[in-house]
Amino acid sequence: LRHFPQGDRRNYVEGSWSGFEYDFSNSVFFYPVDMKDSWYQNSVDFSGCTYYASAEFSGSTYERSAYFCDSTYYDWVFFNNSTYCGEAQWSGSTYHDSARFNWSVYYGEVSFHDSVYGGSVFFDQSLYYDEALFYSSTYRGEAGFDGSLYRGSVFVNDSVFEDEVSLYGSIFCDALNFGTDFFGESYPSRFVQSAPCFVAEKNARATLFGSSSNNFVVENSGYSIALGAKGLPLGCGFLSTGQADYIAAKFREVYEARTYLRDSQVPQERQDLREKLESLSQNIRAWRKEATALPGGN
C-alpha cells in the first residue's frame, strides 16, 4: 500500500507493506472510511463489506484486481478519479445513498451488475478499455454515464431506471445493449420517468457509436428510445473512418504500454510507462470531448 502526499500521484511514498495483498472482505465499518489517495500493488478484496457511515476511496490506483462486490453502503461512497489496472468488481451491491465513480480509468473488465442504487449514481467522464457490465440493476435516483468512452461491449439490459438517465457526450466503440444479454436473449430494460438522454443541447454534446450491433429495445411499459434512420438514437451518429482509425491507434498504444508495464521489473521504466499511460488517457479524453461536440455548439 502506497500513499500519495496531497494526492500527487507522481510522488508516492512506498512503505514496507507495499507488496502485500489486502483482504478486507466481510468487514463491518461503523465509522467513516477514508482510503483515498492509495496505491495497491497487489490485489485487494473489499467484497462483502458493510459501511454504516461514508466511504471515500477516490484518487486511488489498483495495479491488480480489485473486488468490492456484494457490499452494502448506508451512506455516500466515492470512487472518483481512480485507476483500475486489472479486473474490478462491484456487482451484487446495494447503495442506500449516493455513489460516485467519475473520472476513472478501467483497463480490465468492470462489473456493476445485479446492484441496487438507492440514491444518485454517476459514472461520468471515465474510460473503459474492456467490457462494462451494468445489467440486472435498479437505479432509483439519477444515473449518469455521460462524457465517457467505452472500448468494449456495454450491457445495461434487464435494469430499471426510475429517474433521469444521461449518456450524452459518450463514445461507444462496440455494442451498447439495453435489450439483450450475452447470448442474445431478450431482457429489456425499463425507463420509468423519461427516455435516456443521448444528446444534450445545453451542453452541446451528442453520443457517437462505432458499432451497428447495438440494441435499444426496452420495455413497452416505460419510455422508449426514439431512433433515427441509422438505427441510432435521434441526433447521434457513427464514428467517421478517420475517427475510428485514430482511436484504434490509441488503443494499440495503450495495449502496448500496459503489456510492457506488466512485464517490466525496472522501477524507472515502470514509472515512465505509467506516465505514458496517463498522458494517453488525457489525450483520449480531449479527443472524446472534441469528437462529441455538436456543430456550432447546438
Predicted regions and their residues:
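N-terminal leader/targeting and pre-domain segments
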Residues: 1-298
